[in-house]
Structures are given as structure tokens and as C-alpha cells.
Regions:
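Expand to "…catalyze enediolate/carbanion chemistry for C-C bond making/breaking, isomerization
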Residues: 1-186
Length: 186
């Protein structure tokens, strides 16, 4: 699940309902990445509140002890790198223990340098390359979305581990476009 922001209260709510993978947008540096990890883990490794016996994730307490003992190590944490500043800090973000994947946001990255959706811009290309090379040099997983002329196939061939290819809104929009060109059936 992608959270709206790096908010420990929202993160706790999502984890309590059983979310096992968390994507957090606009992570700019290691301090923010560490805050995500801390929000996911129970004390003493983090700050997540321990109301686990009431949470759906622990089957409302029926598996409370098992959940408490394993959950801190079983949440997949994805930090989104989406700005020029974040790319310059990507090595330190990737070095945070507990972060499993770095997900590059090419659209927001292009906007952050004043060239929204101009993926052929040389500065954008250099920033993408820097981020990709830095992440590949770690043991972190690498993710992104298709952008410019980069297709899903291209990105997997470039060793991305996750490529988000469609969202519900885009699928609904395309279906509506197809319906709009058809003759009404009434």
C-alpha cells in the first residue's frame, strides 16, 4: 500500500489492518527513511504502538504473540525517491537498515528539476542513471514506473525488480475512452 505521506499514525493504521508491504512517497534523506522504518517496528527497534491484540493483523489477538514476535521483520518497506535532492541522497537512503526497496518516481523527479514529463531531458537522464546505478550497487530492490519511451520490458531488462505499470484510475479512464467512441446502445 502506498501511504499518502511519511506519517507514523497512518502507517500504524495500515499495519494494524494487515498491510505487509508499505510504499512511502517523497523520502528525501536517511533521517526520513529511518523514520519510516521506526514507524513500522515495535519498541525497542521502533516507535510503533503496541495495540497488536486488537488489530486485524494479529487476527484480533488470536495470533497476537506470533504476530508480535515476527511482524517487525516481515514488513516490506519501499522508500520513494522522487526529487533531485533525494537522488543526491540516494546512497544514504539506501544504507538505512530495514529499507527493502528504493522506488524511483520519474515523473516527480522531472517536475523537481523544472521539466515536468520531459524524460528525454539530459539532466533527468543523468539523475535517473545516478539513482539506478547507486541502488544497483546495494542489496536493495529497485522499482519504478514506465516513463518516456521506457517500457515495462525495457525496465525489467535493465534489472528493475518491480515496475508499476497500471493504476486503477488509468485503467478506468481507458475503458471509458473506448466506451465513449461507441454508439449508444439505448
Amino acid at each position: 500500500v502506498r501511504t499518502p505521506s511519511n506519517d507514523p499514525v497512518m502507517i500504524k493504521k495500515l499495519l494494524d489492518v494487515g498491510v505487509e508491504a508499505l510504499m512511502v512517497p517523497m523520502i528525501e534523506n536517511a533521517v526520513e527513511a529511518q523514520a519510516v522504518v521506526s514507524a513500522v517496528k515495535y519498541p525497542p527497534r521502533g516507535i510503533r504502538g503496541i495495540a497488536y491484540t486488537d488489530a486485524r493483523a494479529s487476527e484480533y489477538g488470536f495470533k497476537a504473540q506470533e504476530y508480535l514476535e515476527t511482524v517487525s521483520d516481515n514488513i516490506f518497506i519501499i522508500c520513494q525517491v522522487e526529487s533531485e535532492n533525494a537522488v543526491h541522497n540516494v546512497d544514504e537512503i539506501a544504507s538505512v537498515e530495514g529499507v527493502d526497496m528504493i522506488f524511483i518516481g520519474p515523473s516527480d523527479l522531472s517536475a523537481s528539476i523544472g521539466t515536468p514529463a520531459q524524460f528525454d531531458n539530459q539532466k533527468h537522464k543523468k539523475l535517473m542513471k545516478k539513482a539506478i546505478d547507486s541502488i544497483k550497487a546495494t542489496e536493495k530492490y529497485l522499482g519504478t514506473t514506465p516513463y518516456g519511451i521506457k517500457t515495462i520490458i525495457d525496465l525489467f531488462e535493465e534489472d528493475f525488480h518491480m515496475v508499476v505499470c497500471e493504476a486503477d484510475v488509468s485503467m478506468l479512464r481507458e475503458s471509458a475512452r473506448k466506451l465513449a467512441v461507441q454508439k449508444p446502445c439505448f
